[in-house]
From Swiss-Prot:
Heterotrimer of A, B and C subunits. It is an enzyme of class 6 (ligase). GO terms for molecular function: ATP binding; glutaminyl-tRNA synthase (glutamine-hydrolyzing) activity. The keyword Nucleotide-binding applies. This is Glutamyl-tRNA(Gln) amidotransferase subunit A. The active site is at residues 71, 146, 170. The lineage of its organism: Bacteria, Pseudomonadati, Verrucomicrobiota, Verrucomicrobiia, Verrucomicrobiales. It comes from Akkermansia muciniphila (strain ATCC BAA-835 / DSM 22959 / JCM 33894 / BCRC 81048 / CCUG 64013 / CIP 107961 / Muc). InterPro entries: Amidase, Amidase_CS, Amidase_dom, AS_sf, GatA.
Amino acid sequence: MSKIQGTLAQWRDRLRRKELSPAELVNLTADAIEADRTTNAYISFDREAALHAAAGADISSPLAGIPIAVKDNINVLGQPTRCASRLLSPYVAPYDATSIRLLKEAGGIPLGRTNMDEFAMGASGENSAYGITRNPEAPDRIPGGSSSGSAAAVASATAIAALGSDTGGSIRQPAGHCGIVGLKPTYGRVSRYGLVAFASSLDQIGPMTRTVEDAAILLQAISGHDRKDSTSANCPVPDFEAALGRDVKGLKVGIPSEYFTSGNHPGISEAVQNTVKQLESLGAELVEVNLPHADAVVAAYYIIACAEASSNLSRFDGVRYGKRAEDAAGLVELFSRTREEGFGPEVKRRIILGTYVLSSGYYDAYYSRAQKVRSLVARDFAEAFSRVDIIVGPTSPAPAPKIGDSALDHLQTYLADIYTIPANLAGLPAMSIPCGTVRESGMELPVGFQMMAPHFREDLLLKTGFALGK
């Protein structure tokens, strides 16, 4: 299979040295996408549109005309945005998301719409109307989700880098399962304008790359204040690449006992502990911290996220855009049949749950309590970060399960995000980097090492991840 090996930084250097043109790189990438018959990482790609953009690419720009894969819930002008759902199958985006506009201004070329769990609801890559995404490292395993296609594309070398979105771990968990780097920025660091919302108070767009350096380059390109997004933070964007060479000596690393438990897969525990020891050998100081509400994060998250989803997805009714049920007898039937025919089972499950917890009889019992837990989780992290610089642990408690296992135990699938959800509830930046493998059924499955930092301190994550990768 044709592959696009090498990092974003390496391809940028090659383009600037004029070893090849942006158009040639677009064709190489498109050829690799067409040759891949295994992962189903892409829903579609537009070679001609990318070649048109490549013709005017500035190789002196930060991204130098490099093609970037884009998750199918981020609007790209003139391209379909389906969110991997039948309901949006006819929709073509009439504008660029702010992250895409900034990507283009930095010299990046959107190429390919990556597969995902429908409307970003899922953690396996199996909940797509366009077929299951497979893990390139083990095709009988899931790649994780919901940014399944973005992770699989980067890991299979059919993309140099990709954009994903993260609501409860949807960048970091698939990054961990596929052995790549995935960074969820601080809530507000990257504009959400043009991202189809799942849970508006939790969603964030971020980079998925092969190296920490590439994550810094791509994050630099898409960060910044945006007046079109009321939740966008109006704060300076630091030089993320400059953070990469900084020393980690004296860095205070928080070790939460709640993340290092006997419930983790033994191989994952060993790989993560080895990475912690590596940090210590680099001069970092290990500090025990407590996150006392860690056992409540999954329940709180699913109440809040589903409540917001039930509201956000009410706009998909067959009236304004997307699929419309035919021959409906009236508006009520139009709405109900459009949604019944268009939404998949997992989306329906979450809409029902969200509507239930927002109903008058259960609002105080569930939604209000979940918001209180969210505040307590944020307070736990604030207290921990008064003593340490970063907090570390496994990205996931277990390696990638086999395809089909998730459908047998939905609760276990939800619990797989227990370590990634807290960063979304607290709005913190978090990054997953590869830290080895575990052997299962004769296969070496990737393990992710997660780091979290205080608000707007992505530089701490990047310098630490870069130091570990040397």
